[in-house]
Amino acid sequence: MKIALGIEYDGSRYFGWQRQDEVESVQQKLEEALSIVANAPIEVFCAGRTDSGVHGTGQVVHFETQAIRPLQSWCFGTNANLPDDIAVKWAVEVSEDFHARFSATARRYRYIIFNNKLRSAILPKGVSHYHYELDHQKMHEAGQFLLGENDFSSFRAAKCQSHTPWRNVHHLNVSRLGNYIVVDIQANAFVHHMVRNIVGSLIEVGQGRQPVEWIQWLLAQRDRTLAAPTAKAEGLYLVDVHYPERFGIPKTALGPLFLANN
């Protein structure tokens, strides 16, 4: 049978999602816990391979197993064998043609900036601190130039392995909740470091170092060296993955927790 899981994790102490030799990853911890429940080796496939230090509130994975377990056992049993910073949120049986990555039609990320002169001791690895005052309205206005299908070479990591830089951005919203600025972006898919590179350049606009139209110009140049530095991993969350309704993938609050109702 094939099972899909919803996964939440604090990526602060992990070297990204993907299993690697000699360092801890989220995938490694999840596979170890699932293998205990299944009493057999389990390999998982995820919707989006997040980088070192990046978090997830809406990650989706699937795995195949011959072990017959109640769905609640895949949740409670796995959580009992996971560290406190990784948790299974739900489990469903899915059809054989479901794939956590290739069946997805969109991914959604949120980047959280604590915009205050003094840093906060709360969630030091859960938000990115930026002490200069940022104009979130200008950041939002600039972000609208990125909507639709475009070549995102200017916001693509140098070592990106994707065959094409073209992606379709469905929405990009920048809002403020007190001292927190939230960059909310959804696209069919993302090139490597795309969200953090976009945020880095939007910060330049928000601080007033560049005009709103600079983002439009950057997009047209298709040159990563002209854009701002990559924003820190702290503050980035994979919050949602979209699938066709026929797969029956549950929808939960987007998160992170302190933004769950916004």
Curated annotation (Swiss-Prot):
Q: Matching CDD domains, A to Z?
A: PseudoU_synth_EcTruA
From the Swiss-Prot or TrEMBL record, give the protein name.
tRNA pseudouridine synthase A
- InterPro entries found in the cross-reference section: PsdUridine_synth_cat_dom_sf, PsdUridine_synth_TruA, PsdUridine_synth_TruA_a/b_dom, PsdUridine_synth_TruA_C, TruA/RsuA/RluB/E/F_N
Q: What class of enzyme is it?
A: isomerase
Per the UniProt entry, the Enzyme Commission number(s) are 5.4.99.12
Among Gene3D superfamilies, the record links this protein to:
Pseudouridine synthase I, catalytic domain, C-terminal subdomain, Pseudouridine synthase I, catalytic domain, N-terminal subdomain
Taxonomic lineage from the root: Bacteria, Pseudomonadati, Pseudomonadota, Gammaproteobacteria, Pasteurellales
User: Can you state the subunit structure given in the record?
Assistant: Homodimer.
**SUPFAM superfamilies, per this entry?**
Pseudouridine synthase
Listed A to Z, the keywords are: Isomerase, tRNA processing
Functional description taken from the UniProt entry: Formation of pseudouridine at positions 38, 39 and 40 in the anticodon stem and loop of transfer RNAs.
Q: Which family does it belong to?
A: Belongs to the tRNA pseudouridine synthase TruA family.
A GO molecular-function annotation:
RNA binding
Is Chloroplast tagged as a keyword? no
GO annotation, biological process: tRNA pseudouridine synthesis
List, from the UniProt record, the residues annotated as the active site of this protein. D51 (nucleophile)
Query: What reaction gets catalysed by this protein?
Result: uridine(38/39/40) in tRNA = pseudouridine(38/39/40) in tRNA
The UniProt annotation places substrate binding at Y109
